[in-house]
Amino acid sequence: MIKVSVMYPSKPGMRVDHDYYRTKHLPLIKSRMGAPLKYYTIDKGLADGEGKPLGAYVAMCYLRCDSVDEYQSSFGPHAQEIREDISNFTDGTSIHQISEVVVENSAKVETAALQRSPID
């Protein structure tokens, strides 16, 4: 399993519409990627490690797929459309990281995440 992390660094005066990100942008990604996107999570930055607002990142999402190839083949054909939608929720830029998931606490964690917010 791989995890694609998309993180938006905090910047003074940065515009971020978290509602749009949650209700439009990520569902767009899910609808375009289809079954290869097993699930996703969205984080909203609140504070840094010392509790100071806003933290290093103002918004983050994590996409889970079985492999890099599955991610690239399902995301790639829609990359331009997805990138063009970014300006609808932020004027910031993102940092991307693809990682291999080495440990995931348990299936219970995944099940709980899926039950919190359906993505289909």
Segments (PLM) and residue ranges:
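Macromolecular interaction modules
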Residues: 1-120
